[in-house]
Each structure stands twice: as structure tokens, then as C-alpha cells.
């Protein structure tokens, strides 16, 4: 009887040591995102430009820009539009200004640069890409902002003489680069389609 009582704890000890439980930390998981099917339509409004944009996006006039209220220059721009992505919780803010002098043109270009590099605090890198479509007189710069910055994509388009349009993509959530990366890659393709199809009227 004493022998059985001795062997029971020993067997339990071996059983406890032999378990195959993995207690290593697991990477954080994120919700699965169901992306809408890619389909596009023409944007034609009472504006001096036109472009192609996704059917799952909503274009609206931005009469009280929430993200840009602090920037008085933006509020004074001729047109403020939002390309809303309701399913993806993001907005591409578009602002247009007519170029009336070289001084205004230089200021607009400098502002675009400053607004992009304002994100340097949280960004791990900022890349600039040249936009050039001479047949349509569409030129500009495309800023890719990596890391946990509030805006991951910014750009401006101009014909250098009469027109200037700036775009900035924001998501309505705390920026976590890993979690928004799939959505960002999806929306970036739409921004590329918009830029490649962009025309001045």
C-alpha cells in the first residue's frame, strides 16, 4: 500500500512534466478584412479637373475639414473634397487652388513638402516619387510615409501655371503600421489609378 502511495505522486509528476503545451508568446492577431471588388468610375464635377476613382468610394465636398481645421491656408483653398472609403475607414483629402502667381506656386509646393515631412516624428522613412504625364500637363511629387505616421500617402499635382491639387490619405484609427498595411496597400492602388487618370479641364 505504501508503495502505491509513493508511485502515484511520482506518476503525476512525470505526467505534468511530459505535457506538450507551448507557452511561448504569440504574435498579435488582427481582424480579417474583406476588401470590395475593384471597380472604377469617372469623377466629373464643377471642378477644373477630372479623374477615375473607385465605385466603393464616396466623393463629397468638405465644408468643415475636421483634420485640417488648424491649417488656415487649407481652409482658404478654392476647393476642398473628400474621397471617403467607408468600408475601409479612410479618407483621401483633396484640396485645390488656382495658381495666380509664381509666389503662390512656390508657397503651395513648399507647403506640400512641409506637410509631408511634418510626419517625420513617427515615420520610419519618407520616399519621394516624381509624377510626370507631359501629354496631360500633370506633374507633381508622391510622398510614401512609412511607419506609424497619421498619413501614409501624400501627393500634389500641378500644371505649373494654372492648377494645383494636393492629396493626403488618412485612416480614422490610431496608426498601427502592421494592422493598416493590407488596407493601405489596397487603397494605394486606387490613389495610383486616380493619379494616372487625372486630367485638367
Question: Can you name each region flagged by the protein language model?
Answer:
Residues 131-136, 157-163:
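A short, structured loop/turn motif at beta-sheet edges
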Residues 35-41, 135-144:
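Short, hydrophobic/aromatic-rich segments at coil-to-beta transitions
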Residues 1-19:
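Sec-dependent bacterial lipoprotein signal peptides
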Residues 142, 166-170:
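Short hydrophobic beta-strand segments that form the core of ligand-binding sensory/regulatory domains
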Amino acid at each position: 500500500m505504501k508503495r502505491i502511495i509513493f508511485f502515484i505522486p511520482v506518476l503525476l509528476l512525470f505526467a505534468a512534466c511530459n505535457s506538450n503545451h507551448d507557452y511561448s508568446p504569440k504574435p498579435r492577431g488582427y481582424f480579417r478584412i474583406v476588401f470590395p471588388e475593384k471597380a472604377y468610375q469617372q469623377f466629373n464635377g464643377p471642378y477644373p479637373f477630372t479623374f477615375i476613382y473607385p465605385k466603393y468610394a464616396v466623393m463629397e465636398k468638405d465644408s468643415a475639414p475636421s483634420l485640417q481645421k488648424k491649417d488656415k491656408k487649407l481652409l482658404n483653398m478654392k476647393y476642398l473634397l473628400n474621397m471617403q472609403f467607408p468600408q475601409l475607414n479612410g479618407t483621401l483629402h483633396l484640396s485645390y487652388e488656382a495658381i495666380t502667381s509664381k509666389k503662390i506656386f512656390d508657397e503651395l509646393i513648399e507647403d506640400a513638402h512641409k506637410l509631408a515631412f511634418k510626419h517625420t516624428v513617427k515615420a520610419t522613412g519618407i520616399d519621394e516619387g516624381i509624377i510626370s504625364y507631359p501629354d496631360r500637363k500633370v506633374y507633381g511629387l508622391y510622398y510614401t510615409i512609412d511607419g506609424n505616421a497619421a498619413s501614409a500617402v501624400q501627393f500634389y499635382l500641378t500644371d505649373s501655371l494654372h492648377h494645383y491639387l494636393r492629396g493626403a490619405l488618412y485612416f480614422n484609427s490610431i496608426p498601427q503600421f502592421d494592422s493598416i498595411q493590407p488596407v493601405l496597400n489596397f487603397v494605394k492602388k486606387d490613389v495610383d489609378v486616380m493619379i494616372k487618370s487625372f486630367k485638367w479641364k
